[in-house]
Amino acid sequence: MNAASLVQRVAGISGALAVAAGAYGAHGFRRSEASDYQRELFDTANKYHFYHSLALLGAARCRKPALAGVILLTGMGCFCGPLYHQPLTNDPSFSKLAPIGGSLLIVGWAAMAL
């Protein structure tokens, strides 16, 4: 399997997970005792998860799909992961990864231009 095909498959899985997380956020998490801030964090994570799942589809078509794909996927994990984790667990210990993840997302978009 070539890099473009792998990145495209990962994008599909990521998109499916974003839909599942969005459904949980809309139907399960919303009914919990979460604060408005926790709901906002979860919604932000889900929004960026969706956006960057679509970006992965684009990365599969760029000149260096493996490079762009790895950077975007790492950025998604470091940005969306802590934003999903904190409202679900009330544990902010991973929140320091979010700025690193955001920076990687920017670099990932730029990598698609290479």
From Swiss-Prot:
| A Pfam cross-reference name | DUF423
InterPro entries under this entry?
DUF423
Tell me the first and last residues of the signal peptide: 1-25
Which regions of this chain are Extracellular-facing, per the record's topological domains? 26-64
Is the keyword Membrane assigned to this protein? yes
Similarity annotation = Belongs to the TMEM256 family.
Q: Which PANTHER family match?
A: TRANSMEMBRANE PROTEIN 256
Please give, as recorded in its UniProt entry, the membrane topology of this protein. Answer: Multi-pass membrane protein
Keyword terms of this UniProt record: Membrane, Signal, Transmembrane, Transmembrane helix
Name of protein? Transmembrane protein 256
GO annotations of cellular component type: membrane
Organism equals Danio rerio (Zebrafish)
Q: Report the transmembrane regions from the record.
A: 65-85, 94-114
Q: Where in the cell is it found?
A: Membrane
Chief localisation class: membrane
Cytoplasmic side residue ranges read 86-93
